[in-house]
UniProtKB/Swiss-Prot annotation:
Domain of life (superkingdom): Bacteria
Protein name as it appears in the record: 3-methyl-2-oxobutanoate hydroxymethyltransferase
Gene that produces this protein: panB
Catalytic-site annotation from UniProt: 181 (proton acceptor)
Subcellular localization, as worded in the UniProt entry: Cytoplasm
Keyword Transferase (UniProt): yes
Reaction catalysed by this enzyme: 3-methyl-2-oxobutanoate + (6R)-5,10-methylene-5,6,7,8-tetrahydrofolate + H2O = 2-dehydropantoate + (6S)-5,6,7,8-tetrahydrofolate
Native species: Acidithiobacillus ferrooxidans (strain ATCC 23270 / DSM 14882 / CIP 104768 / NCIMB 8455) (Ferrobacillus ferrooxidans (strain ATCC 23270))
Amino acid sequence: MHKKIARWVQDKKSGIKRAVVTAYDYPFARLAAEAGVHGILVGDSLGMVVGGGSDTLGVTLEQMAYHTGMVVRGAGDCLVFADLPFGSYEKGPEQAWAAAVTLLRAGADVVKLEGGAEMASTVAFCTERGINICAHIGLTPQRVRQWGSFQRQGTDADSARRLQADAGALAEAGARFLVLEAVPDALAANITRDIAIPTIGIGAGPDTDAQVLVIHDLLGLGTESPPFARRYIEGGRIMRDALAEYVREVGNSEFPPRRKR
């Protein structure tokens, strides 16, 4: 097992929490690494956060590889996760493995895919062939057009049992990590307790082994943030004020300063 991953597994056993951010480029990856963040996810959410799209479905494998390379160059010792985008892995294990290799060649340590027990054979195939897989259940954004909206999952007894079964099947298949998104806190806590691999929560309460937030959300760079996100600063306002000051100084001939020679 990769020594970085082994450290995460040991931290789960010891009750030590890990902090992950979703980032898409070198400058933000470098800031995260310098701040002591433990993991960086190169998410297909780049299609929404930096691409302005309404969902993640238009993101390509080539785009994911490009952004993964940028993040890796700034990530330092952070564990780097990268998303397999919609359409790059659902046909079967062979397609998923080939797509995952592309992201590994871009520098990713772990490749993430969405889906429950139906993806267990794909997880096993990739794991047996040298790919570290992070599974993702609960709210899986790549299915938004099937559901019609981004909605919480596991809120009734039947769906909660199904998600618990999914978690067990994916862990048994060899997944190294499991993302739990937008599920009830108690369900996330139960799954975290029941499986040996580290869980990473987003909108899933405080009891997962790690938490992940989009770096733009926690820095206050977007106009809106998900209800589970915390804006640690109003970075967008600070940046707008700086840009407005630049515009003012240029307009008043204060910048650049006049040189004597």
